[in-house]
């Protein structure tokens, strides 16, 4: 399992002249957040680049676009979220990565201690079914061999140059479709995972999001979308794709015929 995008190393940005009453730690957190989730050309990293990246983030999260660090921005930056960037090359659906085979295999290679294995198996299958019932694509679980999608839990550094950061922060990350590591999804075992009925991170919600990436979807700025990058508590019983999610996945794969919907 590896990260979808490896960001280039770069020197820290100089702090903007107007600190706005925010602490140095908040400014550093903002710099790291923007570098990770709104990456820009390493050659242009300066105070002006900070403002441009901040405006991009504010626009994505539908905040007032000021280019200034404020309390609303800080609140968003402190929310648990997916580890993938919110930006990327805007390609037409015909040129975006997707699975060609109509049957995609997956394998769960490691589990969390927070939930019974049978519960994890069930929730992964449920998350995949949410997507497959809308498109002409089926998923088959395998227990041996090399699957299309590898799913697992890990802590800290786990061999992909993209370490998890402990409780909170980034919850999971995944690959877009492709050979080798393409499609892989993994989850931070330092989180407290739940099935939606108790305290903790709703695994179904996060798995549905990450497996959306495994199918080729990007982050959405619609708060109702399962592809929204930050995590919010959701009811597992009523959890479902938004109309925008369905539209996006069908643009990639087409519609599943009504007779084949599960």
Curated annotation (Swiss-Prot):
The active site is at residue 210. Residues 13-89 form a propeptide. It catalyses: Cleavage of 14-Ala-|-Leu-15 and 16-Tyr-|-Leu-17 in B chain of insulin. No action on collagen types I, II, IV, V. Cleaves gelatin chain alpha2(I) > alpha1(I). GO terms for biological process: collagen catabolic process; extracellular matrix organization; proteolysis. InterPro entries: M10A_MMP, MetalloPept_cat_dom_sf, Pept_M10_metallopeptidase, Pept_M10A, Peptidase_Metallo, Peptidoglycan-bd-like, PGBD-like_sf. Ca(2+) 2 binds at residues 165-166, 168, 170, 188, 191. One of its GO terms (cellular component) is extracellular matrix. Binds 2 calcium ions per subunit. It is an enzyme of class 3 (hydrolase). The keyword Secreted applies. It comes from the Eukaryota. It holds the Pfam family Peptidase_M10. Ca(2+) 1 binds at residues 148, 180, 182, 184. A motif (Cysteine switch) lies at residues 80-87. Belongs to the peptidase M10A family. The conserved cysteine present in the cysteine-switch motif binds the catalytic zinc ion, thus inhibiting the enzyme. The dissociation of the cysteine from the zinc ion upon the activation-peptide release activates the enzyme. Degrades casein, gelatins of types I, III, IV, and V, and fibronectin. Activates procollagenase. This is Matrilysin. It comes from Felis catus (Cat).
């Amino acid at each position: 399992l590896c990260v979808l995008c490896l960001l280039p190393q770069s020197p820290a940005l100089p702090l903007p002249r107007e600190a706005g009453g925010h602490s140095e730690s908040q400014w550093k957190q903002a710099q790291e957040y923007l570098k990770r989730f709104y990456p820009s050309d390493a050659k242009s990293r300066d105070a002006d680049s900070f403002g441009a990246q901040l405006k991009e983030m504010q626009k994505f999260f539908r905040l007032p676009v000021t280019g200034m660090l404020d309390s609303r921005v800080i609140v968003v930056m402190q929310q648990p979220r997916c580890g993938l960037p919110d930006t990327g090359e805007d390609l037409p659906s015909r040129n975006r990565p997707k699975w060609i085979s109509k049957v995609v295999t997956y394998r769960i290679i490691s589990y969390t201690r927070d939930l019974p294995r049978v519960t994890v198996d069930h929730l992964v299958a449920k998350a995949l079914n949410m997507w497959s019932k809308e498109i002409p694509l089926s998923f088959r679980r395998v227990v041996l061999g090399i699957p299309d999608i590898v799913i697992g839990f890990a802590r800290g550094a786990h061999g992909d140059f993209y370490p998890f950061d402990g409780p909170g922060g980034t919850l999971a990350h995944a690959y877009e479709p492709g050979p080798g590591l393409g499609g892989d999804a993994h989850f931070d075992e330092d989180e407290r995972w739940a099935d939606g009925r108790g305290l903790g991170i709703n695994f179904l919600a996060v798995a549905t999001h990450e497996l959306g990436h495994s199918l080729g979807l990007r982050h959405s700025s619609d708060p109702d979308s399962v592809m929204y990058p930050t995590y919010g508590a959701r009811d597992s019983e009523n959890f479902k794709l938004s109309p925008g999610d369905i539209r996006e996945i069908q643009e990639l794969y087409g519609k599943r015929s009504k007779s084949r919907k599960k």
